[in-house]
């Protein structure tokens, strides 16, 4: 997108073809990234296997030392471990816990113990520390989840392994004929060290995976639009994670609810935040009824702030006669057929001179969405028409206020397995043109209206392309308009395996309906 697109409105006027988790837990916002329960089941299985593998690969070196006159040597550590019943839960604002309700392990090693009093006594054998059958041992990690305006940060801060007395058992098997040396204290110390290794290992494993988790919930950070001004456009990522409110599944569907407004970064490096605030609060049924892997929900606030950030800074703007293509049926000249038809006094008073058009910053429209279209209401732009004299003076001749209401239809396309684009088509445009003042007598506003109506078919709304999280490819893509929302749904295929773990049909329920508690 470039300055040509900003000229679109005035170009249309001249018929110029220009290339170009309880109800209320979901905050008002512009964007929501939802990950379904079914997808998370598959991901949790892979994540569980990953953590298990990391723990089983832990370095368990031989140990030796002296404790209260007892010399010990521990060698040949062997570990078996299994994690089951993955869970996550929200503990408070920005704080989650994830883990496994059941962990079983069996840690075995060989020992040799020596004590020297009158004579030196030694014994050897094996020690086994294991989870007792029928006892409950769990593993839980606390996560700090922060969505600030520019980034998402997920960090595992600590892991605990709580269990009751008797849940973890230590067994000593002495292989010598005489076994008299007490070693319980040393065994307890080694067992405690092992628990610390496991909990620290889980914390590290989760933090190593945190960037890919963050990307899943914030796949889009920047809007890929290029303007002549050099401005850049970022998404305000401030927000939170929200669990599905009434889910019987575990893990439940989870959504990153973010502000979703567009933040302008100008060439000076300054950031300009939206003046609008989000107002629409989605309903549970809108956010949680999708059965595909992934759902992006867009509200009117996102579109309003996008228009505001992209269009307003490019104004005021001036269009000169030289900018109009020679092939255009309408030229910025007082003697052209168009201007002599709508303003005869202009032509007689200033024959065959150029016309300059000044455009003021537009008033951004209100955006509403229904099941049929995206509706833009009260989009306004003021323009001044000036004649250019031989002395290069610009003399005001009349001013025009253009108001537009428009309906847009949106379709989701997959440009590749890693990229999708949102393509929009103008269904209708309703112009309202007012001549606010004139220094050349009567100006026929209907001439502008007719040109705009005839030009509807040539209006091309630029499509914007977005990447999916880099770890995945997409399939089963679908888009649908609902009550004040646009929803884009698709299934995800992990690139490393190129196999779908869970594949569900798309069945969106977008009715405006609150669930009963």
Curated annotation (Swiss-Prot):
What this protein is called in its record is UPF0522 protein B
Q: Which residues are glycosylated?
A: 148, 245, 333, 345, 370, 423, 432, 495
- Compartments, as annotated in UniProt: Secreted
Please tell me whether the keyword Secreted is annotated for this protein. Answer: yes
What Pfam families does this protein map onto? Answer: LBP_BPI_CETP_C (PF02886)
Q: Which GO terms describe its cellular component?
A: extracellular region
Q: Which domain of life is it from?
A: Eukaryota
Q: What is its main location?
A: secreted
The record's annotation in InterPro entries points to:
Bactericidal_perm-incr_a/b_dom (IPR017943), BPI/LBP/Plunc (IPR032942), Lipid-bd_serum_glycop_C (IPR001124)
Q: Which GO molecular function entries does the Swiss-Prot or TrEMBL record give?
A: lipid binding
